[in-house]
Design a protein with these regions (language model features):
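Detector for the mature cores of small, proteolytically processed
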Residues: 8-42, 46-148
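Non-Sec secretion/translocation targeting segments of pathogen effectors
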Residues: 144-159
Length: 159
């Protein structure tokens, strides 16, 4: 039986449960196909895979995200807690086999949702860049399509 026929007969076998992390949003557990086209669609273009963690997981991101001006998303940190890279655009966190991607385990799903839970904004400070977590109320308002609340000007009495 050909691979294409197998995919039609058993489509669930060619899907994986992964974490989708989009700029300005909380991570989401999603089910995605394992084909290159599925991965490219999820990240909005050609894919690049990085392996920044000791766990058997990969980060699939848009290879041209920074070049194309996609929104900065989340920082990756070195062992000393310094920003080592910033991912631009949406990315996927997937489990790994010896030669392919696979679903994250439940423990990995929880661990990486926690690691990437807070959306970040970035500030250049001299030669370094700082990642600042976005407050929950701002994330929630963006999700509802609202602008962040503006603080009213304090009442000042003329003396």
């Amino acid at each position: 039986v050909s691979d294409k026929v197998e995919r039609i007969l058993h489509p669930e076998e060619f899907k994986m449960d992964v974490l989708l992390v989009e700029p300005g949003k909380y991570p989401q557990r999603v089910q995605i196909g394992t084909e290159l086209e599925d991965l490219q669609k999820a990240v909005g273009g050609p894919i690049e895979v990085t392996y920044p963690f000791d766990d058997p997981v990969g980060i699939i991101c848009n290879e041209e995200g920074k070049l194309n001006g996609m929104d900065l998303n989340r920082a990756l940190y070195d062992d000393e807690g310094r920003v080592s890279d910033i991912i631009a655009g949406p990315f996927l966190v997937t489990g790994l086999t010896q030669d392919n991607f696979q679903s994250l385990t439940d423990d990995q799903m929880v661990m990486f949702e926690d690691k990437f839970h807070s959306p970040e904004t970035f500030i250049r400070m001299g030669r370094s860049i700082m990642a600042i977590p976005v407050p929950d109320d701002v994330v929630c308002e963006k999700a509802e399509g609202m602008k962040p609340r503006e603080k009213p000007a304090p009442d000042i009495e003329a003396r």
